[in-house]
């Protein structure tokens, strides 16, 4: 939505629908619905309204709220048309917003990662951070290692020109 006019229409639709749900729609199936976002098509003929049902985690309450919103769609559309003063009011589509559930799952994953980090940090205090003897010692010459063959282009630490 790069068009500022479309963005203003979307913001106004969000305010009008939220006020209508709070004050004028008295459907008992409608839970505590919060309008989180509104997206309007470029020709302002369709508006997608994202909502959440707060305080109720069961699927039955979500379904009941969705049915209540669908039944109030005509009243909401006529009020949006009246408030916006547009010749053609956009058709409204209600979509349950999954963002709060995703955010909660992400918070749980981050909390588990933090607990694992704290457990690792507690374990680091009891163990050495590396080898028990960190000092370098000369390695014994193994029979498996090839001798210095003196291949040209290979540096053996001795200058051959002298």
Curated annotation (Swiss-Prot):
Gene3D superfamilies named in the record: 3.30.300.20
Entry keyword Cytoplasm: yes
Keyword rRNA-binding found: no
Compartments where located: Cytoplasm
Acidic residues bias: start-end ranges: 143-162
Chain segments carrying region Disordered: 119-162
Database matches in PROSITE patterns: RBFA
Bias kind Basic and acidic residues: ranges: 133-142
Family in the record: Belongs to the RbfA family.
Function description: One of several proteins that assist in the late maturation steps of the functional core of the 30S ribosomal subunit. Associates with free 30S ribosomal subunits (but not with 30S subunits that are part of 70S ribosomes or polysomes). Required for efficient processing of 16S rRNA. May interact with the 5'-terminal helix region of 16S rRNA.
Subunit-level organization: Monomer. Binds 30S ribosomal subunits, but not 50S ribosomal subunits or 70S ribosomes.
Protein name stated in the entry: Ribosome-binding factor A
């Amino acid at each position: 939505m790069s068009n500022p006019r479309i963005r203003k229409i979307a913001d106004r639709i969000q305010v009008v629908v939220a006020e209508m749900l709070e004050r004028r729609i008295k459907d008992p199936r409608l839970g505590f619905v919060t309008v989180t976002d509104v997206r309007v098509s470029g020709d302002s003929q369709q508006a997608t309204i994202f909502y959440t049902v707060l305080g109720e985690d069961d699927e039955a309450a979500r379904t009941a709220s969705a049915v209540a919103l669908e039944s109030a769609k005509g009243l909401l559309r006529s009020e949006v048309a009246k408030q916006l003063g547009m010749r053609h009011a956009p058709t409204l589509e209600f979509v349950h917003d999954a963002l709060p559930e995703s955010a909660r799952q992400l918070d749980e994953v981050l909390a588990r990662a933090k607990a694992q980090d704290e457990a690792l940090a507690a374990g680091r205090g009891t163990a050495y951070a590396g080898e028990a003897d960190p000092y370098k010692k000369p390695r014994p010459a193994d029979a498996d290692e090839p001798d210095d063959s003196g291949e040209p282009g290979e540096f053996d630490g001795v200058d051959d020109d002298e």
